[in-house]
Amino acid sequence: MTAVKQVKRAVVKAIADAGGMAVESYSAEKFRMSERAVTAVGARETVIEPRGGFEYLGQRADEKTQEVREVYGRRMALTLSLDIYAPRELGADGCETAAETVMQALMTALPEGLRLREMQLGQTEWDKVTGMFRLCASAGYAAYFLCERAEDETVFTDFVLKGTGKERE
């Protein structure tokens, strides 16, 4: 799974765990059927920081096999778009209420490897394409990824967002 997809999934999960509704991708048709406010999480900007290449962090022994693995890290800066849509029945207040849930989730419920740097909220406006109210927001993050390599291997394992475990697609 790509680094950006791992971050988007972590953000969607944090919002859902806080009681909000969030999706990684969306269509206007899908949103029109929703009775709740929905946050669409997308990638706006991604930067591998100059020092974001492979950084040697040390060694870790596997608890089960006692095999020693080298641990490397990678750092990324990214900005996500967080477009919050609310049906006409909820009004602009539906976006505002959902934005509060999103902000709370992003300040308190993210995995260890994802640190919120900044968050910006725009004004709620009527979106003609979806026929819903929309509040455009963005969140800037520092993301930290880890990978391991066994002593006898020359290939690195996949980089995984710190604090999320080894998810596979």
How would you name each of these model-derived features?
Residues E70-L90, G131-F145:
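Oligomerization/assembly interface segments of phage tail-like spikes and tubes
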Residues V11, I15, V23, L80-I84, ...:
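Hydrophobic beta-strand residues in large extracellular and virion-surface proteins
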Residues E63-V71:
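Short secondary-structure capping micro-motifs at structural edges
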Residues M1-E63, G165-E169:
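Small/polar-rich, solvent-exposed N-terminal microdomains that initiate assembly or binding
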Residues C95-D152:
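Acidic-leaning, charged glycine-interspersed low-complexity segments
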Residues T154-E169:
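Short, cationic low-complexity segments
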Residues G53, E148-D158:
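Short, charged, solvent-exposed linker or helix-capping segments at domain edges/interfaces
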Residues A43-V47, L80-R88, L106, L110:
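Generic secondary-structure microfeatures
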